[in-house]
Amino acid sequence: MKLGVLLRNMGPQSTAATMAACARQAEAAGLDDLWVVDHLAIPPDEAEGSGGRYLDPLGTLAWLAGVTSRIGLGVTVLIAPYRPPLPTAKLVATVQELAAGRLQLGLGVGWMEAEFRALGVPRAKRGALTDELLAFLHNCFANDVVEANGQPFIFAPRPSRPPFLLGGKAEHAFPRILRHGDGWMPMTGDPEALREPVSRLRALFAEAGKPPPQVVPLTQLPLDDPPKARAQLAALEALGVTGIVYAERYADSAGFAPVVERLSALA
């Protein structure tokens, strides 16, 4: 099972100096992946902990590609209906190219009413817009020449397609994952809560003749109790969970260092 950690690309921890130090600490500790999050327009009443400051996730990952050399880079999750398909495909391909194939692309439909209003995007169309983006991304990564709005164009660079890991609740996400995705990013690391949906998703993939899905939950772990944390990871792995994104708040790189040390010790 891959061990990943959430890098705060928001709030006071999102300075270049702090993020670079944290990214290098995670890579040096042997962790598998660094993950960032996506928000574009935080309203004042949702700004606790971030002050409304969020760095763009794809821009951050492109920068992290130059700060690191081995560790995987992912976003959990890119809000698909916020993003126009063609520029997004170009950005995703650029990050994958600069990162030498280390990108993992989590995608979701979004939830925050205020952000949809700020972007002028109808929240009721978020599912259809997500499907549109996913279909376009698949087309771009499969073909040298792609068409948009009736105009053919060369899609280059065209590196290997990153895995598409879709967020959302099982009942809504699973049909979309079967059509467009390589796996699921649930919002819990509770083995009992994941037992039935992971089993169901694996069965759906098998019935469709697809390889087993990647399952990468965003979770916390009892890092102060290593035996208990290892037991939770073992239970998740037995279900078919392929990796985790560990999330914990930290004040600065000095506070991040013990987090990655304790997390990497579980490997």
Locate predicted features.
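Glycine-rich, proline-tolerant flexible connector loops at the mouths of alpha/beta enzymes
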Residues: 33-58, 79, 111, 188-193, ...
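Short, acidic/polar
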Residues: 14-26, 88-92, 166-176, 224-237
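An alpha-helical appendage that flanks or caps ligand/catalytic pockets
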Residues: 27-28, 32, 124-160, 185-267
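Active-site mouth loops of central-metabolism enzymes
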Residues: 5-17, 76-86, 161-169, 216-227
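N-terminal beta1-alpha1-beta2 module of alpha/beta enzyme domains
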Residues: 1-67, 162, 261-267
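Internal, glycine-rich beta/alpha segment that forms the wall or movable "lid"
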Residues: 42-48, 62, 75, 81-180, ...
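Hydrophobic faces of well-ordered beta-strands that scaffold small-molecule active sites
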Residues: 3-7, 34-36, 72-75, 103-107, ...
